Amino acid sequence: MAAKDVKLTKLAECAGCGAKVGAGELAKLLSDIKVRKDPNLLVGFDKADDAAVYKVTDDIALVETIDFFPPIADDPYTYGAIAAANALSDVYAMGGEPKVALNVMAVPEDMPSEVVHEILRGGYDKVYEAGANIVGGHSIYDSEPKYGLAVSGFVNPSKMYTNSGAHAGDVLILTKALGVGVITTAVKANMATAEEVDAAECSMMTLNRYARDIMVNYEVHAVTDVTGFSLMGHLLEMCQGADLAAEINVDGPEFLSPHVFELARLGILPAGMYRNRRYAEKYVEATGIARERVDVLFCPETSGGLLIAVAP
């Protein structure tokens, strides 16, 4: 296999966070797992939050997360950078700052070394942009490439955000445009324009660090990042955590391209959309809204924006 012949997205059945196990299936898998009680464990897996948080001192808590996925871009450097930005995002969603990371990688045994090197270089550069360091990792051979990071960061426990603190009357802010899941699926069908691909990749490579650094200056009550469970799925978790309902203007979110609705109408949708919709649609009232517009809101996003509940 020559490096020039490698089309990373052709080696994967699902792209990016579209490969994520659905929220409903995940809840069943974890339903009988006991949670060990620890007064210093501020956020564990039972909270369905973006990362775990463990209190070390009154002023310092450790933020822990891991995220990896199959290729969502053919260019190896771009893929590595997107995967890293996506993993780092969980720390930002908790209000924290990443400090160290470990590579998690699986590659075919015959993949050219220069391709693997470029994936890693993309990851390293994005982690360095975040002000953190990659300090090691683990790699295995697999027929399908996968890359991501285990990330550790820190947050002051008194300044930590969760996805369950929203207040009645809060305003919702989404910091990135939607449509990545539709566009990356359209790429596989040769139905996405170069401009749409560029817009999607640019969005996915953008760190949520910059949104985090702004939001800490405001009265923020809850935060989550919008990834594989879609805007609707992650908003549902936010609502359930606060025992609230939310109202969305379907024309409110920004979209990477108006073409995503036509693509959705034609059925160019990731498999994860159907998993997300099957799980969450019973909680959603969307009477009179065109099916394709709702479908896009259920589509998995990869390295999506922060969804912030803030006082008006």
Feature-to-residue mapping (PLM):
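N-terminal glycine-rich phosphate/pyrophosphate-binding loops that anchor nucleotide-derived ligands
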Residues: 1-93, 132, 167-173, 177
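Glycine-/charge-enriched secondary-structure boundary and capping motifs
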Residues: 2-14, 25-28, 110-133, 142-145, ...
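Short, solvent-exposed amphipathic alpha-helical segments in soluble enzyme
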Residues: 32-35, 78-82, 165-167, 187-191, ...
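A generic local secondary-structure boundary/capping motif
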Residues: 41-43, 51-54, 90-92, 124, ...
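Glycine-rich anion-binding loops of enzyme active sites
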Residues: 57-73, 97-192
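Small-aliphatic-rich amphipathic alpha-helix that forms the alpha element of a beta-alpha
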Residues: 76-101, 118-129, 207-221, 226, ...
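Active-site glycine-rich loop that binds ribose-phosphate moieties when present
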Residues: 150-159, 195-215, 289-291
